[in-house]
Amino acid sequence: MTILGTTFGMVFSLLQVVSGESGYAQNGDLEDAELDDYSFSCYSQLEVNGSQHSLTCAFEDPDVNITNLEFEICGALVEVKCLNFRKLQEIYFIETKKFLLIGKSNICVKVGEKSLTCKKIDLTTIVKPEAPFDLSVVYREGANDFVVTFNTSHLQKKYVKVLMHDVAYRQEKDENKWTHVNLSSTKLTLLQRKLQPAAMYEIKVRSIPDHYFKGFWSEWSPSYYFRTPEINNSSGEMDPILLTISILSFFSVALLVILACVLWKKRIKPIVWPSLPDHKKTLEHLCKKPRKNLNVSFNPESFLDCQIHRVDDIQARDEVEGFLQDTFPQQLEESEKQRLGGDVQSPNCPSEDVVITPESFGRDSSLTCLAGNVSACDAPILSSSRSLDCRESGKNGPHVYQDLLLSLGTTNSTLPPPFSLQSGILTLNPVAQGQPILTSLGSNQEEAYVTMSSFYQNQ
């Protein structure tokens, strides 16, 4: 019996070893499964098919053996407690209307009934939008720019409507030099001057949720290719017409500045900023009222109290006085000899050389009459003929000169007679014969100057 029991024990042990090597032990599978890394990631898509939402999960390590693994979600569900994922090659997904979208759900990786790893995830924070589509680029020749437009399915959805888009473009020969532009609309304008001329460009776009919903970038849209037009003139060259206009404008401005600097003080400043006199005198001149009844008239009635002599009258008197200086001393000397000599020599009448006529007074005897000289106008005029009585002329010689001097003097004139008269007799200093006449001339000139000065003062 002992030998039989030992034999059965050895056979049983051999069976266990053989069965373990052939892979039929479930406990060994569990131990090997616990040694692998089952980390995973998930994303949700809302309203992918009408009102249904989808949840997709996948292992981060692509080498994990997923033959006996399953995914299960529990919590934040409507009408059910848990839901199992469907397996599609290397991914697990579920599409249903029973997501509550409020709160967190528990997602686990299971082998049979045993959970290997679990995560708590809020489906509103792992939203991945759908990729944009209908990407196109249109060139506007007038504006020299490119208009980029695209479309997205989230514009008609209720939940994820606000998206941020990322537009990326590059020149075809530059594989890794992408230029990114973020925008919230579905339209973008690219300026031609920011792109290389005659070059091929590739452009694509993707989206990400914004505001309440959070998540990941969507897949890139299909790429679109466009070519930029050629430019006749390179960026380094300049239009000759524009260059000529620029040069002429520069020189014109420089010339104007130089002329303004040169002519500022003499021409421009007096016109723009005229120099004003003293403000007090200017205001006094502007505000002072003129006096009334100013004596600015040249009417003779306005100068009745002034003695006015014309220049011609003064010149005539000067000529007469000069004539008397030459003629009267000779006549006076002869008459003096006749008076002292008695009857030694017969008296002679005045010759034609000493005859005094109105023409000798300046050829204008009417000037004295105009001045109011009545005696001069009534005085007898000496003729060139001899006197009727030469004897009486010898005795009355002084009276003749006295009448002549009286005819020169006037009652209204300010000029005194050139000789001093005492009781009708003309007296002269025998020592200096010309002195009385010179003295009379000096006084006459001073009186004429005073008269003209008073005339200008009154004026």
Swiss-Prot record:
Q: Where is this motif: Box 1 motif?
A: 272-280
**SUPFAM superfamilies, alphabetically?**
Fibronectin type III
As for PTM, the annotation reads:
N-glycosylated IL-7Ralpha binds IL7 300-fold more tightly than the unglycosylated form. Ubiquitinated by MARCHF8; leading to lysosomal degradation.
Protein's UniProt keywords contain Cell cycle: no
Provide the leader sequence positions: 1-20
Give residue ranges on the Cytoplasmic side.
265-459
The record places the motif (WSXWS motif) at 217-221
Q: Does the keyword Transmembrane helix apply?
A: yes
Q: Which GO terms describe its cellular component?
A: clathrin-coated endocytic vesicle membrane; cytosol; external side of plasma membrane; extracellular region; nucleoplasm; plasma membrane
Q: Which residues lie on this side of the membrane: Extracellular?
A: 21-239
Give a GO molecular function annotation for the protein: interleukin-7 receptor activity
Gene3D superfamilies (alphabetical): 2.60.40.1870, Immunoglobulins
Q: Which residues carry this modification: Phosphothreonine?
A: 282
Domain of life, per the record?
Eukaryota
* Annotated CDD domains: FN3
Which disease is the protein involved in?
Immunodeficiency 104, severe combined: A form of severe combined immunodeficiency (SCID), a genetically and clinically heterogeneous group of rare congenital disorders characterized by impairment of both humoral and cell-mediated immunity, leukopenia, and low or absent antibody levels. Patients present in infancy recurrent, persistent infections by opportunistic organisms. The common characteristic of all types of SCID is absence of T-cell-mediated cellular immunity due to a defect in T-cell development. Multiple sclerosis 3: A multifactorial, inflammatory, demyelinating disease of the central nervous system. Sclerotic lesions are characterized by perivascular infiltration of monocytes and lymphocytes and appear as indurated areas in pathologic specimens (sclerosis in plaques). The pathological mechanism is regarded as an autoimmune attack of the myelin sheath, mediated by both cellular and humoral immunity. Clinical manifestations include visual loss, extra-ocular movement disorders, paresthesias, loss of sensation, weakness, dysarthria, spasticity, ataxia and bladder dysfunction.
Q: What does this protein do?
A: Receptor for interleukin-7. Also acts as a receptor for thymic stromal lymphopoietin (TSLP).
The text of the family note is: Belongs to the type I cytokine receptor family. Type 4 subfamily.
The molecule here is called Interleukin-7 receptor subunit alpha
Lineage, opening ranks: Eukaryota, Metazoa, Chordata, Craniata, Vertebrata
